[in-house]
A protein has these predicted regions:
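Short acidic catalytic loops
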Residues: 1, 19-20, 45-62
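Short, small-residue-biased leader/transition segments that mark boundaries at the very start
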Residues: 2-7
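Alpha-helical scaffolding segments of alpha/beta enzyme cores, especially the outer helices
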Residues: 9-13, 37-41, 72-83
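Alpha-helix capping and helix-loop boundary segments enriched in small/acidic/polar residues
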Residues: 12, 25-33, 61-72, 78
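Aromatic-lined carbohydrate-recognition surfaces of secreted/lumenal glycan-active proteins
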Residues: 16-31, 78-99
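Short, acidic/polar
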Residues: 30-44
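Short, hinge-like loop/turn segments at secondary-structure boundaries
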Residues: 37-38, 68-69, 105-109
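Glycan-recognition surfaces
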Residues: 86-168
Length: 168
């Protein structure tokens, strides 16, 4: 059928299941309007997990990612996904509160600075060593590896810094 099917077959031949990505681009109400169709599409096409993204200022009112309005949305999306037996890995979502114990289909939240921050802000070398003892107390974490070029000036000539890491 399509290129996605080619990738799914290749992954399946190696014992790997594909995860669908739903990037909302911060248009949360629009995403909510389409959740049933999106989740049904996933079920119909053999996807049982989704990584949902919320990059940007939340539309329509500029809500905060960690505010009550968005917390209500995250819970709504996780409950709706449970109805379809879909696992959720929420990216740019709120820090975990323990709802993964009530909704075990919530398999992870990012809610931590991954190495994608190295490109523009940098993380301290010890940052990732602290996460299991700080961030992961609240629940499972999605850590985004994001950057593999350690010399930032190769991506941005004005940035002469190097990724602070033990990777040479």
């Amino acid at each position: 059928r399509g290129l996605g099917d080619v990738y799914k077959r290749q992954a399946a031949s190696k014992g790997i299941k594909m995860m669908m990505h739903h990037e909302t681009s911060a248009s949360v109400r629009n995403y909510e309007r389409h959740l049933d169709k999106a989740y049904q599409f996933m079920v119909d096409n053999g996807y049982n997990s989704v990584k949902s993204g919320y990059v940007g200022n939340i539309i329509p009112r500029g809500e905060h990612h960690y505010g009550q309005w968005m917390n209500n949305h995250y819970l709504y999306a996780v409950k709706k996904a449970a109805d379809y037996k879909i696992m959720v890995n929420a990216h740019e979502a709120t820090r975990p509160t323990g709802i993964c114990r009530t909704y075990p289909n919530l398999i992870g939240n990012e809610s931590a600075r991954g190495t994608e921050y190295e490109a523009f802000a940098g993380n301290k070398p010890f940052h990732t060593t602290l996460l299991p003892f700080t961030r992961q107390i609240g629940g499972p974490m999605d850590y985004t590896p994001g950057i593999f070029e350690t010399h930032c000036n190769k991506m941005n000539p004005a940035n002469n810094s190097q990724v602070r890491s033990t990777i040479a």
